[in-house]
Amino acid sequence: MFNIKMTISVLLIALIVLLIIILVVFLYYKKQQPPKKVCKVDKDCGSGEHCVRGSCSSLSCLDAVKTDKRNIKIDSNISSCEFTPNFYRFMDTAADEQQEFGKTRHSIKITPSPSESHSPQEVCERYCSWGTDDCTGWEYDGNEKEGTCYIYNNPHHPVLKYGKNHVIALPRNHKHA
């Protein structure tokens, strides 16, 4: 009788130890995540993912901006943005001209010719893309026919505010992030 109780006790202890080992191993492997895929452009990532700071991510555009642009300040009225190949684009958004980032903008008047196939916004974006690495953003204020393009070259962290009919874009994965 004593041997049976002893055998049952040993089996219960062994079962408990085995369950604890399985639980620890399960929790350890659950915490382990596959390494993030390294990327340079969105095409390097899977469907629904974007390249954010050199890693593929499924973050929303607004969360990606906050990850990529450390210490950025965004007005609570701004609830979304969109990914473009080189920029995070915000509609109805402007830089706060009272802050360091907004104080040093340079204006460029854009009035495309009728034969030009690009919109003024596209011209503004290309100006920033083709410029030097010092372009830290562009802003367009106007309509589809004409407006003013502002180029930013200040590495200070942007402060964005609501601005009707303004479009602002910040470079993705930029050296001044």
Curated annotation (Swiss-Prot):
Intravirion side stretches: 1-7
Annotated TM spans: 8-28
Membrane-topology descriptor: Single-pass membrane protein
Record's keyword terms, sorted: Early protein, Host cell membrane, Host membrane, Membrane, Transmembrane, Transmembrane helix, Virion
Top-level taxon of the source organism: Viruses
Subcellular location: Virion membrane; Host cell membrane
Induction conditions: Expressed in the late phase of the viral replicative cycle.
A GO CC term assigned to this protein in UniProt: virion membrane
Virion surface side: 29-177
Homology family: Belongs to the asfivirus inner membrane protein p22 family.
Protein name: Inner membrane protein p22
Organism: African swine fever virus (isolate Warthog/Namibia/Wart80/1980)
Organism lineage string: Viruses, Varidnaviria, Bamfordvirae, Nucleocytoviricota, Pokkesviricetes
